[in-house]
């Protein structure tokens, strides 16, 4: 409601400025859409005599929460929108002093879709902080490296993960699904971490460095301060914010194997993994030999097999 009123005021101002000649007629509708974000929530705490308590006034013991000042037990309420009246607020200055602004921002974006409420938890903030620290440690583990003429399977797998992440995070940011973008960044970090345990192979050192630099570029909108420091530590003179957004190499980002749904008489009966470049004959052979499809054929020969490459297969009996 609050945001809607602001949009109405802005619309009235736009109309007035059109009337005075300060804006063109095309500005009559100044906003294309409204995106209403969720609220930040937290548990409520109440003393035995009915007083609302702030999270700082409560110690969360293993058995039950207690009031620090009195040692008395505390009633824990549901996680609801933070409000001064119920004192279920967290001081952002304290969080920033302990973890930094980037950690707070990263947690807020990672916990849930932006249109839904996000529950503020100490464990969630701690998890975001640990992830950022892990990325920082890569600076000592991933040296600069030049590309090689040919990539080993391990290098190719990591490069594919990197470029799939670029494509996914780009789409997620454009679609406001920031929590999915953060999840993809964690997956890329895991892939990079796993590669550090693999013996060196052709192209792997370059693939690691590419993954790390890409990780910093994609993290920059969410953790701008630390990623700028890390970027400079890697030896770059141009600030990260001034570098172009990475482009995904779709020949690497595209999966070699796809999941193809299979219908029998119009009803989905199976899903099969097939090579992306498989021809219709190969797909038909694979489908008809699949146990789930044979069960519905029950020994009968199909009247027709309709193959739409990359989309679906329908077996008519």
Regions found by a protein language model. Give the residues of each.
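Conserved phosphate-binding loops in nucleotide/dinucleotide-binding enzymes
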Residues: 44-101, 115-126, 251-254, 273-277
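A short, contiguous, amphipathic alpha-helix enriched in charged residues
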Residues: 277-297
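Short, conserved secondary-structure transition motifs
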Residues: 36-46, 220
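Helix-rich, typically C-terminal accessory recognition domains appended to large enzymatic cores
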Residues: 22-30, 94-273, 306-312
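Short, conserved micro-motifs enriched in small and acidic residues
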Residues: 1-8, 206, 221
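Alpha-helical support elements that line or immediately flank enzyme active sites
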Residues: 7, 11-21
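Phosphate-backbone binding interfaces of nucleic-acid-interacting proteins
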Residues: 297-317
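Active-site phosphate-binding and catalytic loops of NTP-dependent enzymes
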Residues: 18-25, 292-302
């Amino acid at each position: 409601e609050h945001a809607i009123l602001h949009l109405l005021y802005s619309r009235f101002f736009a109309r007035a400025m059109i009337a005075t000649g300060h804006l063109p007629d095309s500005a009559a509708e100044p906003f294309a859409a409204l995106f209403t974000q969720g609220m930040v929530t937290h548990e409520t705490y109440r003393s035995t005599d009915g007083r609302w308590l702030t999270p700082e006034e409560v110690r969360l013991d293993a058995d039950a929460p207690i009031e620090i000042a009195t040692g008395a037990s505390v009633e824990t309420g549901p996680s609801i929108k933070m409000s001064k009246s119920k004192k279920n607020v967290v001081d952002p200055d304290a969080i920033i002093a302990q973890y930094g602004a980037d950690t707070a921002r990263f947690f807020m974006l990672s916990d849930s879709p932006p249109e839904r409420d996000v529950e503020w938890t100490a464990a969630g903030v701690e998890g975001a902080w640990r992830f950022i620290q892990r990325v920082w440690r890569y600076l000592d583990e991933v040296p600069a490296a030049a590309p090689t003429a040919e990539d080993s399977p391990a290098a190719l797998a990591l490069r594919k993960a990197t470029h799939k992440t670029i494509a996914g995070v780009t789409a997620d940011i454009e679609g406001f699904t920031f929590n999915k973008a953060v999840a993809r960044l964690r997956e890329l970090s895991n892939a990079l971490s796993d590669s550090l345990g693999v013996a060196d192979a052709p192209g792997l050192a370059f693939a690691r460095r590419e993954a790390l630099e890409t990780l910093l570029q994609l993290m920059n909108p969410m953790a701008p301060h630390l990623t700028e420091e890390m970027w400079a530590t890697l030896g770059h003179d141009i600030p990260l914010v001034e570098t172009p957004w990475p482009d995904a190499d779709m020949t690497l980002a595209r999966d070699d194997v796809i999941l193809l749904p299979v219908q029998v008489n119009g009803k989905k009966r199976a899903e099969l993994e097939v090579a992306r470049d498989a021809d219709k004959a190969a797909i038909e052979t694979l489908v008809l030999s699949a146990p789930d499809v044979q069960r519905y054929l029950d020994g009968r020969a199909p009247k027709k097999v309709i193959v739409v490459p990359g989309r679906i297969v329908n077996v008519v009996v």
